[in-house]
Amino acid sequence: ACCVYKICYPC
């Protein structure tokens, strides 16, 4: 998964 500022979402 891709994570930015503790928010993760599918890549």
Curated annotation (Swiss-Prot):
Coiled coil: none annotated. The keyword Translocase does not apply. It is found in: Secreted. GO terms for cellular component: extracellular region. GO terms for molecular function: toxin activity. Keywords: Disulfide bond, Secreted, Toxin. Expressed by the venom duct. Transmembrane segments: none annotated. Disulfide bonds join C2-C11, C3-C8. The cysteine framework is X (CC-C-C). Belongs to the conotoxin T superfamily. This is Conotoxin ar5c. It comes from Conus araneosus.
